[in-house]
Amino acid sequence: MLRFNVRVYGLLIHDEKVLITDELIGNKNITKFPGGGLEYGEGTTDCLQREFAEELATEIEIVNHFYTTDFFVPSAFDNTQIISIYYQVKKTSNKEIKLPHGDNPVKNLRWIELKKINPDDFTFPIDKKVAELLRNKN
């Protein structure tokens, strides 16, 4: 049986910098773009808005589609194939992004200059590809 794991991520760009997160998933430290897993019955943009609200206490607006996985990537955690969808997003308010308290996998936020973004700084192969696309675009 084929099993797919759909992930949705946001590229929040401000002042020529993109937001990335450092997270603890299981016992692994992960560096990635903000976002997460699509839940059953949820659209991709709804998923991304939920993830930003839950993990970053931030409301966002979808600007445009940026990239969808176009190569095979097995999950690092289970026996599924990862399909990741990336959107460029913007905040809907001027409130500073703060990490919510409690059971939050996000441990740190960082703004990385687009011209200095390094694909090797990311954990997952799809994020590395997106970092390369961002770097080449700027």
Per-region residue spans from a language model:
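A short coil-to-beta-strand element that immediately follows conserved catalytic motifs
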Residues: 59-68
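NUDIX/MutT-family hydrolases
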Residues: 88, 99-131
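Active-site-adjacent beta-strand/loop module that shapes the phosphate/pyrophosphate-binding cleft
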Residues: 73-97, 110, 133
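A generic structural micro-feature
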Residues: 2-4, 30, 77-83, 103-106
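Short connector loops at helix/strand junctions that flank enzyme active sites
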Residues: 5, 13, 33, 60, ...
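Short loop segments at secondary-structure junctions
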Residues: 14-17, 24, 90-95, 114-116
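Conserved Nudix-box catalytic region and its N-terminal flanking loop in Nudix hydrolases
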Residues: 14-54
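Conserved N-terminal beta-strand and adjoining loop/helix that marks the start
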Residues: 1-18, 88
